[in-house]
Regions:
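S-adenosyl-L-methionine
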Residues: 1-95, 123-187
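Conserved Class I SAM-dependent methyltransferase catalytic core
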Residues: 217-265
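Mobile active-site "lid"/loop adjacent to the S-adenosyl-L-methionine
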Residues: 188, 192-220
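Conserved class I S-adenosyl-L-methionine
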Residues: 92-102, 121
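Conserved acidic residues
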Residues: 41-45, 186, 230
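Conserved SAM-binding loop of SAM-dependent methyltransferases across substrates and taxa
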Residues: 103-117
Length: 266
């Protein structure tokens, strides 16, 4: 079960726009917000500022940011390949179900790949993280910097154009998959590695308490195979035993990468 400790939500400025954003967060399902600091212990915080929303746990602060999606988009616009897109084989007009949304890095790349007529559904088991990412996507265009680097600016604009195609849902992926009709999406994607990265990375430390470190279940994979029209894709550590345990064929490539992609064709 994910940690449901209260999160202290606060404004950096008494600004009408920020108050509206605060009200939006308070309406999100499943979140345990408080506006009163605890005298017994330090609570994790979500701070709404004129420069974005920040999650803080201890000494570490995390803003919503496209992160590696920005670098990957620069590479894609420059004509280079992307292993995630090679694994998922997403096409214009496809529907992608990202069953482990995390911070939405892969979902942003997927949303760009499926184009204007495509759709990305992102599932996140933590209600706080789901709200944080949805807010970031809602305000993505505001993040675009005045970049002198034309390639970087083009990547920002491409991701901002793709971000509205992502629908964030709070929920446990296996239960959500059970409710979907058979063959209702093109690709189902799992990236449980995000949870392990949160545990090890200092930059991701504010997200650690909301991460689910449980392994993927066979039932979730069976449901994903029922729901997908084309394929189910798993990202894991290179040489991970999870591929064999869950029945995925590992794709070749990425000789120097620390990760591999596995695929089940349906």
């Amino acid at each position: 079960m994910l940690n449901n400790k209260p999160v202290l939500i606060k404004l950096a400025h008494l600004d009408p726009d920020l108050l509206e954003r605060l009200e939006w967060f308070q309406q999100q399902p499943g979140c345990n917000w408080t506006i009163t600091p605890s005298g017994e212990e330090d609570l994790p915080e979500l701070t709404i500022t004129r420069h974005g929303v920040f999650m803080t746990d201890g000494a570490k602060q995390l803003p919503f940011h496209p992160s590696m999606a920005l670098i990957r988009m620069m590479n894609l616009l420059g004509g280079r390949s992307d292993r995630y897109l090679e694994a998922t084989q997403l096409k214009a007009g496809d529907t992608l179900l990202d069953a482990t949304l995390g911070l939405g890095t892969e979902a942003l790349i997927g949303a760009w790949a499926v184009g204007e007529n495509g759709r990305v559904v992102g599932l996140e088991q933590s209600p706080v993280l789901a709200a944080f990412v949805q807010d970031g996507l809602n305000h993505f265009a505001e993040l675009i910097p005045d970049a002198r680097n034309k390639q970087k600016l083009a990547a920002w604009v491409a991701l901002a154009s793709a971000s509205p195609r992502i629908e964030v849902h709070w929920g446990e992926h296996c239960e959500y998959l059970k409710r979907l009709p058979s063959r209702s999406v093109n690709v189902v994607y799992f990236d449980p590695m995000f949870r392990n990265t949160c545990y090890r990375s200092d930059s991701m430390e504010p997200l650690h308490r909301w991460s689910d470190h449980n392994p993927l279940s066979h039932e979730a994979i069976l449901q994903a195979c029922r729901v997908a029209q084309n394929r189910v894709v798993l990202k894991e550590r290179k040489d991970s035993r999870e591929f064999q345990r869950l029945g995925f064929d590992v794709l070749s490539g990425g000789q120097y990468s620390k990760v591999d992609y596995g695929v089940i064709l349906v």
